[in-house]
């Protein structure tokens, strides 16, 4: 196949447990995304859950990353087959599925990205992902080149981490530290020992099933600790956070 998307290098890197350093994109801006794509990150999350993103804003961001070595990962707003199908059709191959609590929910996410008989993805013969029908073996290659990362961020998800990690087709486990902290009774305090112990437990159980773990860690000390604990893919910051910090610093330099 003469298509740079296949094979999926990010999926292969996760399977090989190669450390992948990423960044979170929440500004919903093609220009910002293009700048991130030039920075040298291994992967970038384009957030469709908490950021103001939808199909119309994500397509220009995918275009902005064309030619970048950074793998685009979309966090969908919910584990819903129609939403996932639309993200597939516009050209995403790497998915972060929020708030997965059971093996059944994990399996549903996988099925949503696979064509029958392996899954339930609807079939369109011409869309952006298959270069509008010009990729002859897209149907044969697509199923095995999709990355599914499921996000554990509740007590029920923690309780079911073994079953979730063992789900066929799940490529990785991602910890949502803020929601996990809230679920454990420590809203706004992901550094609480209970939360940190739970994160370490999730990492250990995922590793026991041979699945790589990831997390968002905008504080350097946290990111380095999670890497020491065995995290494979870590988002070490965000465009929003970097922009706010740098502009605040600039203003403070001259205003104070």
Swiss-Prot record:
The active site is at residue 50. Binds 1 Mg(2+) ion per subunit. Mg(2+) binds at residues 153, 179. GO terms for cellular component: cytoplasm. Its cofactor is Mg(2+). Keywords: Lyase, Magnesium, Metal-binding. It catalyses: 5-dehydro-4-deoxy-D-glucarate = 2-hydroxy-3-oxopropanoate + pyruvate; 2-dehydro-3-deoxy-D-glucarate = 2-hydroxy-3-oxopropanoate + pyruvate. GO terms for biological process: D-glucarate catabolic process; galactarate catabolic process. GO terms for molecular function: 2-dehydro-3-deoxyglucarate aldolase activity; magnesium ion binding. It is an enzyme of class 4 (lyase). Its EC number is 4.1.2.20. The record marks 89 as: Increases basicity of active site His. Gene3D superfamilies: Phosphoenolpyruvate-binding domains. Pathway: Carbohydrate acid metabolism; galactarate degradation; D-glycerate from galactarate: step 2/3. Substrate binds at residues 151, 178-179. Belongs to the HpcH/HpaI aldolase family. KDGluc aldolase subfamily. Homohexamer; trimer of dimers. Catalyzes the reversible retro-aldol cleavage of both 5-keto-4-deoxy-D-glucarate and 2-keto-3-deoxy-D-glucarate to pyruvate and tartronic semialdehyde. This is 5-keto-4-deoxy-D-glucarate aldolase.
């Amino acid at each position: 196949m003469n298509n740079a998307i296949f094979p999926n290098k990010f999926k292969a890197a996760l399977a090989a447990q190669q450390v992948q350093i990423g960044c979170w994109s929440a500004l919903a801006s093609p220009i910002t995304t293009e700048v991130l794509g030039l920075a040298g990150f291994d992967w970038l999350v384009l957030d469709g859950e908490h950021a103001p993103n939808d199909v119309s804003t994500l397509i220009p961001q995918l275009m902005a990353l064309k030619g970048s070595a950074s793998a685009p990962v979309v966090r969908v707003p919910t584990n819903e087959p129609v939403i996932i199908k639309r993200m597939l059709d516009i050209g995403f191959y790497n998915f972060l599925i929020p708030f997965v609590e059971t093996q059944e929910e994990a399996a549903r996410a996988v099925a949503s990205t696979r064509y029958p008989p392996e899954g339930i993805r609807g079939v369109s013969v011409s869309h952006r992902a298959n270069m509008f029908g010009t990729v002859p073996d897209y149907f044969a290659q697509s199923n095995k080149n999709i990355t599914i990362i499921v996000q554990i961020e509740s007590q029920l998800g923690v309780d079911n981490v073994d079953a979730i990690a063992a789900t066929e087709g799940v490529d990785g486990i991602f910890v949502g530290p803020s929601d996990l902290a809230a679920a454990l009774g420590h809203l706004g305090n992901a550094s609480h020992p209970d939360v940190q112990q739970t994160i370490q437990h999730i990492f250990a159980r995922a590793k026991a099933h041979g699945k790589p773990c990831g997390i968002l860690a905008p504080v350097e000390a946290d990111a380095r600790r999670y890497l020491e604990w065995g995290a494979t893919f870590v988002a070490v910051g965000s465009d929003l956070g970097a922009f706010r910090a740098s502009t605040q610093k600039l203003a403070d330099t001259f205003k104070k």
